[in-house]
């Protein structure tokens, strides 16, 4: 079987995961993931088709990390000071970032010498969502000598995940669409609000 045929087969298995033969294996793995640490460096990607499509290469300078994030909305400590009821909210608060972006940021915190290239979903249970994050060592010779990925070593791409420059960051900022209705997203939601004052 060619590599493209293999990736296609893996993609089809993950598309209909609950009907697939690997579902029981994934469920068993998620039980282990739930009780393990929240960020784990992996030897190989779990979904080789997604990793390759998003730029992963099996060579020095690239690593894959599994990141675990708690599902659901956000909450904060109960406010004890006085205020009107509308401003006392402490649960059912919607996050301003996606869980995927939070997973990327946590992986970047764990490996400060590396840049986040991209990430993909690998599963969820009742409590957590799991993502695998592709990280690149910006100072590795394999990286800055590779014409396809050397751009990540340039200074303007340092800390890109914290500035919303990954795919998940673009989506959260509303920059995926360029059609009618997206005018308030540019140059950013915050600065657009300032310009309109």
From Swiss-Prot:
Gene3D superfamilies: Ribosomal protein l15e (3.40.1120.10). One of its GO terms (biological process) is cytoplasmic translation. GO terms for cellular component: cytosolic large ribosomal subunit. Keywords: Ribonucleoprotein, Ribosomal protein. It comes from the Archaea. Residues 175-197 are annotated as: Disordered. GO terms for molecular function: RNA binding; structural constituent of ribosome. NCBIfam families: PRK04243.1. Belongs to the eukaryotic ribosomal protein eL15 family. This is Large ribosomal subunit protein eL15. It comes from Thermoplasma acidophilum (strain ATCC 25905 / DSM 1728 / JCM 9062 / NBRC 15155 / AMRC-C165). The gene is rpl15e.
């Amino acid at each position: 079987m060619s590599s493209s045929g293999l990736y296609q087969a893996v993609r089809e298995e993950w598309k209909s995961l609950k009907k697939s033969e690997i579902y029981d294996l994934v469920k068993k793995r998620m039980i282990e993931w739930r009780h393990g640490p929240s960020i784990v460096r992996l030897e190989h990607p779990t979904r080789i088709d997604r990793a390759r499509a998003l730029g992963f290469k099996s060579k020095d300078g690239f690593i894959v990390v599994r990141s675990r994030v708690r599902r659901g909305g956000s909450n904060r400590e109960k406010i004890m000071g006085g205020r009107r009821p509308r401003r006392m909210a402490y649960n059912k608060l919607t996050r301003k970032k996606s869980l995927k972006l939070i997973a990327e940021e946590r992986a970047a915190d764990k490996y400060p010498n590396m840049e986040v290239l991209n990430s993909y979903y690998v599963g969820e249970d009742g409590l957590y969502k799991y993502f695998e994050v592709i990280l690149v060592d910006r100072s590795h010779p394999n990286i800055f000598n590779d014409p396809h990925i050397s751009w990540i070593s340039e200074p303007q791409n340092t800390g890109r995940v914290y500035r919303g420059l990954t795919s998940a960051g673009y989506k959260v900022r509303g920059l995926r669409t360029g059609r009618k209705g997206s005018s308030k997203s540019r140059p950013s939601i915050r600065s657009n609000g300032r310009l309109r004052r």
